[in-house]
């Protein structure tokens, strides 16, 4: 069993444990009013979220939210139906992004889950042509009464000229936000002329790394990794330090 599977298993266990979510909230969920912010037309209780990879089915995002993140990125979803069933049955305790990059039919997955999440994420790497698909996704969004943000996540295997191409596409087509690794935050802000919110994602192992990427201009931080040694307290510890900055 990998560390990621172990952590996912812990949250799944807390979902089915009687009062599991309530226990997590009582132990780890704290309010930091000074960290609240509005991004993408959405209200975030703080800038820290959990990126895709931990809740790959959209089954226990509320249990993850109970330890402090303001948003959870579910997926990459292979099948949106499990996530939709959970989203229909349980009120969301946080902002929920859906990563549809592993969905067999991205356009169908987008249409099905659109009404149930707060934003949708698509991955762009050197071996995918996601921007071609995005034209159809943007068209589909126009048929919905409620506007939901679309986020493009740029993988680190892209070359700088591909970041430039992506930035041009984002500006030209009204993509709402972009996710990049910490070392590309400054580049993307420059390429988009500070017109598009940047979300920094990756394995942040310390408060200093999180604080630095926020200082570099990231609006939000999506943690791709929760250190096992710090347990459920990790995010709360980050928020306590950020609130004192």
Each predicted region: which residue ranges?
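N-terminal capping/small domains of soluble enzymes
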Residues: 1-104, 238
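Structural preference for beta-strand elements that scaffold enzyme active sites
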Residues: 47-50, 71-73, 93-99, 118-121, ...
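Glycine-rich beta-to-alpha transition loops that act as phosphate-gripper elements at the mouths
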Residues: 52-55, 99-102, 154-160, 197-208
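Catalytic cores of alpha/beta
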Residues: 59-64, 108, 158-172, 190-195, ...
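Acidic (Asp/Glu)-rich catalytic clusters
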Residues: 64-67, 84-93, 109-117, 137-145, ...
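Glycine-rich phosphate-binding active-site loops on the catalytic face of alpha/beta enzymes
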Residues: 72-79, 120, 124-126, 177-183, ...
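Alpha-helix-loop-beta-strand connector modules within alpha/beta enzyme cores
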Residues: 80-94, 132-152, 156, 184-200, ...
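Active-site glycine- and acidic-residue-rich loops that bind
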Residues: 100-107, 129-133, 149-171
